[in-house]
Amino acid sequence: MSVEAMVQTMIDDLTAALGDAVKHDKGNAAAGTRVRKAMQAAKTAAQDVRTKVQADKNA
């Protein structure tokens, strides 16, 4: 997968999490759990992008 595609996937996933963020702001605790899960997935995806960029640089 290209770095561009990886970043676009992250953007799409974070955009999808916006609905739960709004619900969390209105007091929905379960939505907060979903937001935290999405943020953890974004963190993992960001690390994957960093690893790929570094590997491409060193290749």
Could you say what each language-model-derived stretch is?
Residues L14, L18-A21, M39, K43-A46, ...:
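A structural signal for well-ordered alpha-helices, especially hydrophobic packing surfaces
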Residues G32-Q40:
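Short, charged, amphipathic alpha-helical segments
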Residues M6, A30, T44:
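Residue-level recognition of oxygen-bearing side chains
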Residues M1-D20:
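N-terminal acidic leader/helix
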Residues E4, V53-K57:
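Membrane-interface helix-loop junctions in multi-pass transporters/channels
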Residues V35, K57-A59:
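Charge-rich, acidic-biased intrinsically disordered regions
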Residues D25-G32:
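Short, surface-exposed loop/turn segments at secondary-structure junctions
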